[in-house]
C-alpha cells in the first residue's frame, strides 16, 4: 500500500508499545485514533515512548522513537553509532538473547496464522557470532552535492537515502572497518558520480570488491582502483553492465572458495555468486539440516534450490546418491565443478526453473527417499505442487522467509498428509529482523 506523507502530523505523541512486528518495529495502538495501529521504529514491547509520525496510510501509521520514557529491561545501548539511521540493523537496541526469541516468535506466529499448523517440537534456535559475520553484501554509493561528499553504505530506514557510514560492525572487519576509507577514495575519482553500488564478497583466500560503473573508467581511475585494492587487501573487479560483464581489473582475478571442513568439502565460487553470508552459522546450519534429515548411506536425496552445492556436497558424503537442482545455470556449472573438485561422483546437478512446470524432466521422474530444499524468499509452492511427494519419508525445509515457509507448510500438512515434526529459527543475520528457519516434515 502506498504511504502518504502529505497529511503527516509531526507533533510528538506518547504511546505504549504492545508488541514487536516481523520487521523489528514496535507496535502501538494510538488512543484518539480509534486504536489505529502504528509501527514505531526503535521501540520495544512494554516501553512508553515519545514518537514522531513519519508516514500515514488508511490501515496503519508509521513513526520513529524520539524519546524513551519508560524503557524495557531488554533494551541495550546499540553498539553501532549509525543505529537508528542505517536500515542494515534494526534490532541492536534489543538484548542479543532476546533477538532470537523474537525471531522464534515470528516464525511460530507465521506458521499458525498463515499455514494453520503447529510443530510437534520447537527446535532450539541456532545462533553464532553476532558481530563481524557478514562476508557478502552490497553497498550503495551516492555522490551528494549538498554534502560535497560521496556516501558509501546500506540504505537508510527511508530507502530513498544512503546511510553515511564510517564503519559497519556486522560486516567482516576486512571490509567493515574500511567503509570510510572507501568513501574518501571514491570521492577522489574522476568518475565518482558514475558508481551506484559496490558488491563485496570474501572467500578463504581473498576479499573481492565488484565495482558497478555506468561509464568507462578513465586510465587514472583504473590505476587508482588498483592502488586502493593493493593498499587495503582487496581484489578489484569491474562491472559495466549485467552479470556477464564482470571482469577482474588486472585481467587475471583470483580464485575464490571456502571450505566446509567437517565434510572435507571446498566450494569454489565467483564474485557475484550467491553464498550464505554468515560462514560459521552456515556450517552449523548444514550440520543441523543433515542431522534432521537423518540421511541413510543407501538413500537417494533430492536437494532443490541447491546453488553451489552448499548442502548437496556434504550430503554426498553421507548417502548413496544426491541430486541437486538449481535455476541459475552458472551456479549449476560451478556445482558440477565443485563435485569433481571434491571427488564426489555420486552428486548430480540439473538446471531448472523451479517456478515452472518440470514434470517431464528426467530428475523429476527419478525416485528419492528424502528431500531437502532451501528456496528463495518466494518459497517453493510451485515445485511442491508438482513433486510426487508421497515418495519422501522426510523433508527438511530451510527457509529465509517465515511467511512463505508457513504457506508451504500449510500445503504439506493440510493438503498432502505430512506432519510438521519440528521447526525453529536460525540467527543467520544477527541484529536484523531477518528470520532464517528450518522445518522438518514426515509422512503420516
UniProtKB/Swiss-Prot annotation:
What the entry lists under InterPro entries is as follows:
23S_rRNA_MeTrfase_RlmD, MeTrfase_TrmA_AS, MeTrfase_TrmA_CS, NA-bd_OB-fold, SAM-dependent_MTases_sf, TRAM_dom, U5_MeTrfase_fam
Q: Which PROSITE patterns match?
A: SAM_MT_RNA_M5U, TRAM, TRMA_1, TRMA_2
Which spans of this chain does the record mark as coiled coil?
none
Q: Do you know which Pfam families this protein is assigned to?
A: tRNA_U5-meth_tr
**Residues at the active site:** 400 (nucleophile)
| Transferase keyword on record | yes
Q: Which domain of life is it from?
A: Bacteria
Q: What is this enzyme's catalytic activity, as reactions?
A: uridine(1939) in 23S rRNA + S-adenosyl-L-methionine = 5-methyluridine(1939) in 23S rRNA + S-adenosyl-L-homocysteine + H(+)
Looking at the record, the residues that make up the TRAM domain are 5-67
What GO terms in the biological process aspect are recorded for it?
Answer: rRNA base methylation
Name the positions where [4Fe-4S] cluster binds.
80, 86, 89, 168
Asked if the keyword Methyltransferase belongs to this entry, the reply reads yes
Q: What is its EC number?
A: 2.1.1.190
Question: What Gene Ontology molecular-function terms does this entry list?
Answer: 4 iron, 4 sulfur cluster binding; iron ion binding; RNA binding; rRNA (uridine-C5-)-methyltransferase activity
Q: Which UniProt keywords apply?
A: 4Fe-4S, Iron, Iron-sulfur, Metal-binding, Methyltransferase, rRNA processing, S-adenosyl-L-methionine, Transferase
Which residues does S-adenosyl-L-methionine bind? 276, 305, 310, 326, 353, 374
Identify the Gene3D superfamilies for this entry.
2.40.50.1070, Nucleic acid-binding proteins (2.40.50.140), Vaccinia Virus protein VP39 (3.40.50.150)
Which HAMAP family does its entry note?
23SrRNA_methyltr_RlmD (MF_01010)
Q: Which PANTHER family does the protein's record reference?
A: 23S RRNA (URACIL(1939)-C(5))-METHYLTRANSFERASE RLMD (PTHR11061:SF49), RNA M5U METHYLTRANSFERASE (PTHR11061)
What job does the chain carry out?
A: Catalyzes the formation of 5-methyl-uridine at position 1939 (m5U1939) in 23S rRNA.
Name the family. Answer: Belongs to the class I-like SAM-binding methyltransferase superfamily. RNA M5U methyltransferase family. RlmD subfamily.
What protein does this entry describe? Answer: 23S rRNA (uracil(1939)-C(5))-methyltransferase RlmD
Q: Which organism is it from?
A: Stenotrophomonas maltophilia (strain K279a)
The gene is rlmD
Amino acid at each position: 500500500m502506498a504511504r502518504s506523507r502529505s497529511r503527516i502530523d509531526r507533533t510528538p505523541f506518547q504511546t505504549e508499545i504492545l508488541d514487536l512486528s516481523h520487521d523489528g518495529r514496535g507496535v502501538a495502538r494510538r488512543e484518539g485514533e480509534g486504536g489505529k495501529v502504528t509501527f514505531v521504529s526503535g521501540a520495544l514491547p512494554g516501553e512508553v515512548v515519545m514518537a514522531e509520525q513519519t508516514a500515514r496510510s488508511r490501515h496503519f501509521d508509521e513513526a520513529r522513537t524520539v524519546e524513551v520514557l519508560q524503557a524495557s529491561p531488554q533494551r541495550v545501548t546499540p553498539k553501532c553509532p549509525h543505529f537508528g539511521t542505517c536500515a542494515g540493523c534494526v534490532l541492536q537496541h534489543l538484548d542479543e538473547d532476546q533477538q532470537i526469541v523474537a525471531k522464534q516468535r515470528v516464525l511460530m506466529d507465521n506458521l499458525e496464522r498463515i499455514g494453520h499448523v503447529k510443530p510437534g517440537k520447537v527446535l532450539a534456535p541456532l545462533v553464532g557470532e553476532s558481530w563481524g559475520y557478514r562476508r557478502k553484501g552490497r553497498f550503495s554509493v551516492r555522490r551528494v552535492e549538498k554534502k560535497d561528499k560521496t556516501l558509501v553504505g546500506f540504505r537508510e530506514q527511508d530507502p530513498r537515502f544512503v546511510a553515511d557510514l564510517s564503519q559497519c560492525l556486522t560486516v567482516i572487519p576486512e571490509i567493515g572497518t574500511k567503509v570510510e576509507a572507501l568513501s574518501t577514495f571514491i570521492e577522489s575519482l574522476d568518475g565518482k558520480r558514475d558508481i551506484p553500488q559496490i558488491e563485496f564478497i570474501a572467500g578463504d583466500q581473498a576479499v573481492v570488491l565488484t565495482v558497478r560503473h555506468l561509464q568507462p573508467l578513465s586510465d587514472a581511475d583504473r590505476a587508482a582502483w588498483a592502488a586502493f585494492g593493493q593498499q587495503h587487501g582487496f581484489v578489484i573487479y569491474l562491472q559495466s553492465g549485467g552479470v556477464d560483464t564482470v571482469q577482474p581489473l588486472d585481467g587475471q582475478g583470483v580464485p575464490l572458495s571456502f571450505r566446509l571442513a567437517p565434510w572435507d568439502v571446498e566450494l569454489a565460487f565467483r564474485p557475484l555468486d550467491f553464498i550464505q553470508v554468515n560462514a560459521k552459522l552456515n556450517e552449523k546450519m548444514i550440520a543441523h539440516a543433515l542431522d534432521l534429515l537423518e540421511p541413510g548411506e543407501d538413500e537417494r536425496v533430492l536437494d532443490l534450490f541447491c546453488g553451489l552445492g552448499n548442502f548437496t556436497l556434504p550430503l554426498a558424503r553421507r548417502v548413496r546418491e544426491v541430486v541437486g537442482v538449481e535455476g541459475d545455470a552458472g551456479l549449476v556449472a560451478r556445482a558440477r565443478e565443485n563435485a569433481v573438485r571434491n571427488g564426489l561422483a555420486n552428486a548430480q546437478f540439473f538446471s531448472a526453473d523451479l517456478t515452472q512446470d518440470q514434470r517431464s524432466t528426467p530428475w523429476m521422474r527419478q525416485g528419492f527417499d528424502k528431500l531437502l530444499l532451501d528456496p528463495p524468499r518466494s518459497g517453493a509452492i510451485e515445485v511442491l505442487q508438482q513433486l510426487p511427494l508421497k515418495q519422501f519419508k522426510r523433508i527438511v525445509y530451510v527457509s529465509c522467509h517465515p511467511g512463505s515457509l508457513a504457506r508451504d507448510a500449510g500445503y504439506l500438512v493440510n493438503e498432502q498428509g505430512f506432519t510438521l515434526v519440528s521447526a525453529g529459527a536460525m540467527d543467520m543475520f544477527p541484529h536484523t529482523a531477518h528470520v532464517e528457519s528450518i522445518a522438518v516434515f514426515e509422512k503420516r
